[in-house]
Amino acid sequence: MSGSFDYIGWIVIPSLQMGVVVCAIWARSFLRFFPLNFYMLVATLFTAARFFTMVQYGVRSSQYYYFYFYSDALLTICLFFALMCLFSHVFQEMGARIYIRIGAILVIGLISAVSYGMVRQAQDKMVTHFAAELSQNLYFVGAVLSYVLWVAIRKLRETRTQLIQLVLALGVYFSAFAASYAQSVLYPNSLVWRLVSYAMAIWLPLAWGYTFLRIPEGARLTTARVALGSR
């Protein structure tokens, strides 16, 4: 990264992420959507840690290389649990929260096993390859589950505007990253996937922050609009 990308990556994005937490606290939604806010807090802390690691050891150092991929894998896991939090809110009237939590743990365990199986032959930097593969697979699964959740919202005629906005924003984020990972495999020298990562890193905190700030907890969509969307 250089120039304006440095400014975006080290200053703008962490500021937006902390802005989400502030907006959630102001809207009294911090605890209700704690996994979402926890992700933003951890993302901000990891960005600061990456910056200090880069300053201390250099952007091409092995220390920065390892920390970047390990922290990215942990962030993706946090984001996956944020998605499961949204699942819990959508299905809360069915009393399915405990099953969703168990399912989330099982899915992460399965994805971890698959990711390990895909990289276990790599003798060089196997752990780093595993972290990168785990992140990539979680993004693909997250994109699919976001679509499943959106279908459930339409079928159940969910009307909570705030919840719907949070789901849509995260669905766009997961889908864009999954597409960018696929594109990077086909065209490894292309800069498109890097631009997408910056755009989505700005998009998600902006969308969530706007939702907490501008959409009240009790806001509802009209039943007619939800019914029309489910057809």
Where does each model-flagged region fall?
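N-terminal topogenic module of multi-pass integral membrane proteins
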Residues: M1-R60
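Alpha-helical membrane-inserting segments
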Residues: L45, A49, T53, L83, ...
